[in-house]
Amino acid sequence: MDVSGKKIVLFGGTSGIGLAAARQLAALGGEVIAISRDPGKAGDPGPGITLKQGDVRDREALQALFKELAPFDVLISAATGGDRAIGPFLSMDMDGFKGSFDKLWGYANVVRYGTEYLADNGCIVLVSGTPARKTRPGQIAIGSVGGAVEAFARGVAPELAPRRINVVSPGLIDTPMVGLKGDERTGFYGKATANNLIPRAGTADEVAQGIVFAVQNEFITGTTIDVDGGLLLS
């Protein structure tokens, strides 16, 4: 797909991976609407990007937003969906575990209510993460959610055809979601990625390149694109 002149609706597009994708798609000539619960945190997102407020978990408001923005060519969700439970499952608060699945419900809402207004040759891109297929201790919640997102995309792809749907799966990425600073931040990423085939954290721009590829390549659907520095193989 030639992105130039296409309308792109991007949830979670005001920080981190989502904002990086918004900027790259806008640089290619796309008309990007970047949506999040707090669009102000994007600051000045740059040319070609319009900011809007929205919550993928609010189905009624989401349907109204899609009607307002329709029609569009590309639908992307990099929204986290809320809090993520971390730690051993057998001592985990089950409300926290359940809340982690807000990401899945949000993605399902985006696909369910957005497809109606998506161009016949349009595409959808979702974001999961390597814990979906390589779950480390303490990652049972995010691993389960990511696995469900990838299975959801594979399962719904035949219904969406000829529209496409794909998932981009990041490894450990240096984004604002990690609240550490200075030497503590550097040490965390260094230790966490020491055994990667590419021994460093990825960048939001590198993951965004995977999202752009999923948009542009018209011969892929129902699959997952890994941008993880070889983490799955380490």
Ranges and model annotations:
Residues 77-96, 179:
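Conserved mid-core segment of classical short-chain dehydrogenase/reductases
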Residues 14, 21-23:
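N-terminal Rossmann NAD(P)H-binding glycine-rich loop of SDR-like oxidoreductase domains
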Residues 203-227, 232:
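C-terminal substrate-recognition "lid" of short-chain dehydrogenase/reductases
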Residues 57-71:
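Conserved Rossmann-fold cofactor-binding substructure of NAD(P)-dependent oxidoreductases
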Residues 46-60:
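Rossmann-fold cofactor-recognition segment
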Residues 173-195, 234:
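A glycine/serine/threonine-rich, flexible loop-to-helix segment
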Residues 150, 159-174, 220-227:
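Conserved Rossmann-fold SDR core element
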Residues 88-110, 117, 123-161, 172-173:
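Catalytic loop of short-chain dehydrogenase/reductase
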